[in-house]
């Protein structure tokens, strides 16, 4: 490999890693005294964890011959992975699932839908794409 090609590959890789890749949206939550939360799209690792989490629930439902997948705690799980504070730190941890589930369900659903749309997942992503076309 020539030096020029090697430098070109390195600069391309550096360029890829230097680009802000995760879309985000700051949301004011009036139901939570107007706090602002930044919802960020899932990164690759978070997306892998999400896919595994949902696949496990799907497999469990199929194994039990259930037609409905147990979605208990899914909105809380999404927020644990995608809600950030003003310092850019994840706002919640796995320890917060139970407490999050006690919060207003409409708020959890609204924030989770934003996260799903930003992450390009499911119905939320399809609706967002339709709105932008």
Where are these regions (language model features)?
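Extended acidic low-complexity intrinsically disordered regions
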Residues: 1-23
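Short, surface-exposed, charged amphipathic helix/loop patches that serve as local interaction elements
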Residues: 2-6, 32-133
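Short acidic-hydrophobic surface loop/beta-edge motif
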Residues: 23-33
């Amino acid at each position: 490999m020539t030096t020029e090609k090697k430098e070109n590959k390195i600069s391309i890789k550096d360029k890829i890693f230097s680009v802000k890749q995760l879309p985000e949206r700051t949301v004011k939550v009036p139901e939570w005294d107007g706090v602002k939360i930044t919802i960020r799209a899932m990164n690759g690792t978070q997306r892998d964890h999400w896919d595994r989490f949902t696949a496990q629930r799907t497999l469990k439902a199929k194994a039990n011959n259930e037609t409905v997948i147990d979605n208990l705690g899914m909105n809380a799980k999404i927020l644990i992975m995608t809600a950030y504070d003003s310092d850019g730190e994840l706002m919640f941890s796995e320890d917060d699932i139970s407490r999050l589930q006690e919060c207003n369900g409409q708020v959890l659903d609204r924030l989770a839908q934003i996260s799903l749309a930003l992450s390009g997942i499911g119905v939320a992503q399809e609706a967002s794409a339709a709105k932008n076309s």
